[in-house]
Amino acid sequence: MENINDITISYEDEGEILVEELGKVILTRGAWTSILFRYRERDRQTGAMGPPKAALRRYQKHNGLFKKRDAINLSVESARTLISTLQQWLDEGLLGAAAEDQ
């Protein structure tokens, strides 16, 4: 991919959608780009689409193209822990400019 906005988690095989992107948020832009995706996967046994999931992907721009370098799939439990921990750190002033003095 040459353009950050064109990066997707969607995947098809022989015209069948196996991974469907439901949304994305570009967290960082530049030579290293981080994107949070919301997606769902097709269950190969039933053929039905599964429940929504979340994934964090990091891409590196090299020779004008973005290549996936890291991938973290977040379970519901991991997502809740991540949210609550970040919220706690923000509430306690442990992130951002105020945290530099601590």
Residue ranges and their predicted role:
Residues 1-102:
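Positively charged, low-complexity terminal tracts
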